[in-house]
C-alpha cells in the first residue's frame, strides 16, 4: 500500500476519516491524497480552481497553504506534509473518482459515513454511500473518532469459500504492512448452522497457503453474522473489521446485505474489499 485516498466534504465524520487515513498513511509510510468536492474548494488559490476540463481532477500542491489546503494540513499535522496531496473535483461523480483512483494508482480509499444515514436507503445522498457501491478499490468507512495512534488488531470475517482466497492475499498484505495482528473469524448462526468439524476443516483448508503465525483462527456463535462479528471485534478490542463482498452484487457473501448491515451499525471502521 503506497497511495491512500480520503474523501473530504466538510462534515465531522469526514474529519474522523481524514484523521484515520492520515494515521494509516503514517503507519504504512504511504502518500495521502485528500479529495475535495465543489464548494469545499473556495479557499484554494484561484489558479488552482481552473480546470482544463470540467470533469478533469485538479491537483493542489501540498505546499499551497491557503484556504482549505492549509486547514486540511493543520488537521493532520502529525503526518509529514511532503506525503500530503490535495485533489479536487467540481462535483461528486463516481466514474471520475474511479478514473482518479486509476490515474493515481490508489491502493485504498477512506471515507466518513454520517451516523444518521443508512447505506441501504433508497436515496443515496452521501458521498460515502455512493463510493461503497461504486468504487473500484478497497474502501474503509469511518463513523467515529479513531482514538488510537495506529491499527494494531484486525478482524477478518468470512465464510472462507474458494472465491475469497485471491482477494485475501491483498488483505493479508495490507495487515502485514500495518504490522497488525489479524484474527480470522467464522460466525456460526442458527439459520446456517455448521458443526465444529466442518468449520475447522474449512478454516484449516483456507489458511493452509499462508504462514500460520500470520493470523489466528476463531469461531463465534451468534444469532446473526453481523452480531457475531461486532461482538467478537469488541471482545478483542479490534481497530478494524475486514470483509470481502462480490463485485456484481456488492453485498452478497456470507449473508444477504452483510456488509451494508455492518457499515450501518458498526462504530469500528469497516474495510470492504470487492471480488473482481
PLM region spans:
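Short, flexible loop segments at boundaries between secondary-structure elements
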Residues: 268-276
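Small/aliphatic-rich secondary-structure junction motif
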Residues: 1-53, 153-219, 238-240, 265
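Charged helix-capping and loop-helix junction motifs
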Residues: 124-127, 198-202, 254-261
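Local beta-strand N-terminus motif with an aromatic residue
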Residues: 1, 105-107, 137, 151, ...
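A short acidic, glycine-rich active-site loop
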Residues: 52-66
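Short secondary-structure boundary segments
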Residues: 36, 113, 186, 244-246, ...
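Hydrophobic alpha-helical segments and helix pairs
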Residues: 96-144
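Structural beta-alpha unit
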Residues: 74-109, 210-260, 264, 268
Amino acid at each position: 500500500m503506497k497511495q491512500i485516498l480520503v474523501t473530504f466534504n466538510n462534515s465531522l465524520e469526514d474529519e474522523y476519516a481524514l484523521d484515520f487515513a492520515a494515521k494509516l498513511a503514517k503507519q504504512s509510510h504511504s502518500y495521502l491524497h485528500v479529495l475535495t468536492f465543489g464548494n469545499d474548494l473556495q479557499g484554494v488559490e484561484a489558479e488552482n480552481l481552473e480546470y482544463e476540463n470540467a470533469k478533469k481532477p485538479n491537483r493542489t500542491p501540498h505546499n499551497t497553504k491557503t484556504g482549505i489546503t492549509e486547514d486540511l494540513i493543520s488537521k493532520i499535522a502529525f503526518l509529514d506534509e511532503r506525503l500530503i496531496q490535495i485533489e479536487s473535483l467540481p462535483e461528486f461523480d463516481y466514474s471520475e473518482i474511479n478514473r482518479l483512483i486509476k490515474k493515481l494508482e490508489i491502493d485504498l480509499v477512506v471515507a466518513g459515513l454520517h451516523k444518521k444515514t443508512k447505506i441501504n436507503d433508497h436515496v443515496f445522498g452521501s458521498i460515502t454511500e455512493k463510493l461503497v457501491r461504486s468504487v473500484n478499490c478497497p474502501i474503509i468507512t469511518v463513523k467515529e473518532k479513531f482514538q488510537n495512534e495506529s491499527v494494531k488488531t484486525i478482524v477478518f470475517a468470512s465464510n472462507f469459500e474458494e472465491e475469497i482466497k485471491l482477494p485475501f492475499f491483498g488483505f493479508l498484505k495490507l495487515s502485514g504492512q500495518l504490522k497488525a495482528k489479524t484474527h480470522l473469524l467464522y460466525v456460526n448462526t442458527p439459520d446456517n448452522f455448521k458443526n465444529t468439524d466442518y468449520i475447522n476443516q474449512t478454516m484449516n483448508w483456507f489458511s493452509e497457503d499462508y504462514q500460520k503465525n500470520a493470523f489466528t483462527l476463531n469461531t463465534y456463535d451468534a444469532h446473526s453474522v453481523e452480531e457475531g462479528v461486532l461482538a467478537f471485534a469488541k471482545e478483542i478490542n479490534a481497530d478494524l473489521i475486514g470483509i470481502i463482498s462480490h463485485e456484481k452484487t456488492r453485498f452478497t457473501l456470507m449473508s444477504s446485505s452483510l456488509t451494508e448491515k455492518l457499515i450501518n451499525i458498526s462504530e469500528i471502521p469497516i474495510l470492504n474489499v470487492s471480488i473482481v
